[in-house]
Amino acid sequence: MQKITVLCVGKLKEAFYEQAVKEYEKRLSRYCKLELLELPEQRLGDEPSEAEIRQALKKEAALVEQKLPKGGALIAMCIEGQEMSSVALSEKMQQFAARGASQLTFLIGSSFGLDEDLKKKADLRLSMSPMTFPHHLARVMLLEQVSRAYQIEAGTKYHK
């Protein structure tokens, strides 16, 4: 069974997001071993400078590096990443598995995104949309798409 790690910078605060995450954890349990890791987001003032943002992203990246699972494939969620359909994501996940990646790690950055050096280490940069979403919602959307990807692979009727 493949292991999926979703590593997020920032914690869920609203109960409705937590409920949605729990629902997708339940759905995914038949397809993979899911691990959700949350790391603290660096606190910045209301109008941080570019230098302050870069410094915060570097600090967050250092924490991420400590928690990244060894081996497997790293998928960085970022707006400039590749957009793909649900079917294409399912195929990409299958390709990673066929190449021996028994573990996939999806990385969701803080509200300021991800450090550039961290993105360069990713095997895939993935974008959900050119639109901007709250990171808490992005987590739910990612879990839904991972669930859908497994169901596409299994040939269930969920995906239409």
Please name every model-derived segment.
Residues 1-28:
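N-terminal beta1-alpha1 ligand-phosphate binding loop
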Residues 3, 101-107:
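Loop/turn-to-beta-strand initiation segments
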Residues 7, 35-37:
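General small-molecule cofactor/ligand-binding pocket signal
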Residues 12, 79-82, 110-113:
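Short glycine-rich anion-binding loops that position phosphate/pyrophosphate groups of nucleotides
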Residues 29-35:
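A generic structural motif
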Residues 112, 116-160:
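Structured adenosyl-cofactor binding patch, chiefly the S-adenosyl-L-methionine
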